Amino acid sequence: MIDELRQKYTLKILLRISGLSKPTYSYYRCEKHLNAVKRRKEEDERILSLILLVFEHHKSRYGYRRIILALKEELADINHKRIQRIMRENSLFGKQPKNKYHSYKGDNGEKKDNLLLHKEVDEESHRTKYVRDFDTSKPNEKWTTDVSEFRCAQGKLYLSPIMDMYDGSIISYDISVSPDFTQTKRMIDKAFKQYPDLKGLIFHSDQGWQYQMKPYQKWLNDKGIRQSFSRKGNCMDNSLMENFFGIMKNEMYYGHKFKTLAELRKAMEEYIIYYNTERISIKRKGLSPLAFRQQSLSQIQLSY
């Protein structure tokens, strides 16, 4: 009560009216402060225990933003700065990119159309600029693919995945010791088996040799799929897939030593399952790629 009235009255007057001595007042004030500190510390420990459950489950892959998203119900009333402070004080930092990664590139062929690139003219400067359009309104409108190399003590593995631009989910993938055309066919066959009706889909890739093979182009054409290519030497035209490779390598590859190809393959397969089913994103409203996809597909079915 005294502390609340100190804005209007001097401490001397308040102590005289209350009958408290200054040492007694100082003692109670100190005790009140210590109790508040104790309660705050206990609450910090409770918050930390929740954070650790998520942080350890996701193998140190989550920074404070994803931690907040994963614990949005448990920590609904907690300020994000407090969570960030607790994680910083306990050295809980999400993995950050440290190494550059390089997608495997086959030999380029002739130039092809980029269906995701649109020209716009600036009204003031009248200059033409190119704008990439990765936006989609529903699943299976735009897919993208690429190949990336993973090394271990025993040799190399190549990952060839297909990603849906709508939700970031990995539709299909193949892991091989050689980035050959057989790998591309296995990947395509898995995707087509899962989704037989893909008429109108835009399927994007770089200008790798495998994507310019006549059989590959016929597979797409027979399904009514429109093929799209990145411009030569422009990795940003396929930045969604490049970003996926970067995230994957940062979270399960860099900093880990794999002795055998079998060990590396197992880690890659487990990560793709984790990425699809557990790795949440702010862009996907706190859902994993497959959870967001299933939600969207369910809404589409209900609308019919």
Which positions does each model-derived feature cover?
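C-terminal domain-tail junction helix/linker
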Residues: N221-I225, I247-Y304
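Residue-centric detector for conserved, function-critical "anchor" positions
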Residues: M1-K8, I13, C30, Y304
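Short, acidic, Ser/Thr-enriched surface-loop or helix-capping motifs
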Residues: C152, D164-M165
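Active-site beta-loop-alpha junctions of metal-dependent nucleic acid enzymes
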Residues: R151, G155, D174-P196
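Two-metal-ion RNase H-like nuclease active-site motif
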Residues: E141-F150
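RNase H-like two-metal-ion nuclease catalytic core shared by retroviral integrases
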Residues: S103-D107, S205-Q207, M213-Q217, Q227-K249, ...
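Basic, flexible linker segments flanking DNA-binding modules
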Residues: S26-T136, N234, L290-L297
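Mobile genetic element proteins and their domesticated derivatives, centered on retroelements
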Residues: L14-L15, Y25, I51, I67, ...
